[in-house]
């Protein structure tokens, strides 16, 4: 882990991304809340927000930026069109482009939704001795589309996406305890063990992000992931949408501790 990026103030990180730095944000600005982004035209916004409400494990909303505004209340002076390291542009449900600044393609009627990200709790996992293989090896976290269908909302539907972190079985209970305290960044895992149970045919071929080594004796642990709205875009095919590129998050000024709740969620 890079100590300089781990200790960087969120505002400084956002400025670097605004100036063109492209990098996954796992390990950046430890202790602060990171967020996934999905932005859609106003005529789809209510349905997307309802989709998130109905699927809070995968899509815990932490801010909604209405049409005509670009600053999140969670980050003073921010601009959600430029302060993410990389964006994906979707046309009719197909990935049309990936850009480092979405200002020129952002439409006046677009509503932005920020969804809590599991990168937020990684420093807490690491402090308990739980490995973060993707961070240790300089890779993006692996993410997979699953056979778990989210609850639909109007025209919006699609399968849950999960992120995966391998660990020894003896650490699983600790991981559950630590992450269950932060439901606004996905909370406790949705599955431990066999990836086939989630419809994942080859764990070494993630749908998003990078594959990581699962060492002898380790088990894969899966958390619901905020790339799920992108899966919904692919399935529902709205005419236009903008998202973060998987693993490249919006870093807020909000301490992770602000979202911490008493533990009590378990598999």
Curated annotation (Swiss-Prot):
Pfam families: D-Glu_cyclase. This is Putative hydro-lyase Arth_3576. It is an enzyme of class 4 (lyase). The lineage of its organism: Bacteria, Bacillati, Actinomycetota, Actinomycetes, Micrococcales. Its EC number is 4.2.1.-. Coiled coil: none annotated. InterPro entries: D-Glu_cyclase (IPR009906), Putative_hydro-lyase (IPR038021), UPF0317 (IPR016938). It comes from the Bacteria. Belongs to the D-glutamate cyclase family. Gene3D superfamilies: PSTPO5379-like, PSTPO5379-like domain. The keyword Cytoplasm does not apply.
């Amino acid at each position: 882990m890079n100590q300089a990026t781990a200790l960087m103030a969120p505002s400084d990180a956002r400025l670097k991304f605004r100036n063109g730095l492209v990098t996954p944000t796992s390990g950046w600005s430890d202790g602060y809340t990171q967020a996934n982004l999905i932005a859609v035209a106003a005529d789809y916004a209510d349905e997307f927000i309802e989709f998130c409400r109905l699927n809070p494990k995968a899509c815990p909303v932490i801010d909604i930026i209405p049409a005509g505004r670009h600053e999140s209340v969670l980050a003073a002076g921010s601009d959600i069109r430029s302060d993410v390291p990389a964006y994906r542009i979707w046309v009719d449900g197909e990935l049309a482009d990936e850009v480092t600044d979405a200002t020129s393609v952002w439409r006046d009627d677009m509503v932005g939704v920020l969804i809590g990200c599991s990168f937020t709790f990684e420093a807490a996992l690491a402090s308990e001795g739980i490995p973060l293989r993707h961070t240790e090896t300089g890779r993006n976290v692996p993410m997979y589309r699953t056979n778990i269908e989210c609850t639909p909302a109007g025209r919006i539907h699609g399968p849950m996406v999960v992120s995966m972190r391998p660990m020894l079985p003896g650490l699983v209970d600790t991981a559950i305890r630590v992450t269950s305290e932060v439901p606004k960044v996905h909370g406790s895992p949705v599955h431990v063990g066999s990836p086939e149970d989630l419809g994942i045919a080859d764990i070494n071929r993630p749908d998003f992000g990078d594959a990581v080594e699962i060492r002898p004796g380790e088990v894969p642990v899966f958390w619901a992931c905020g790339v799920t709205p992108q899966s919904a875009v692919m399935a529902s095919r709205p005419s236009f949408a903008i998202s973060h590129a998987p693993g490249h998050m919006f870093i807020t000024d909000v301490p992770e501790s602000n979202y911490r709740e008493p533990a009590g969620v378990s598999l």
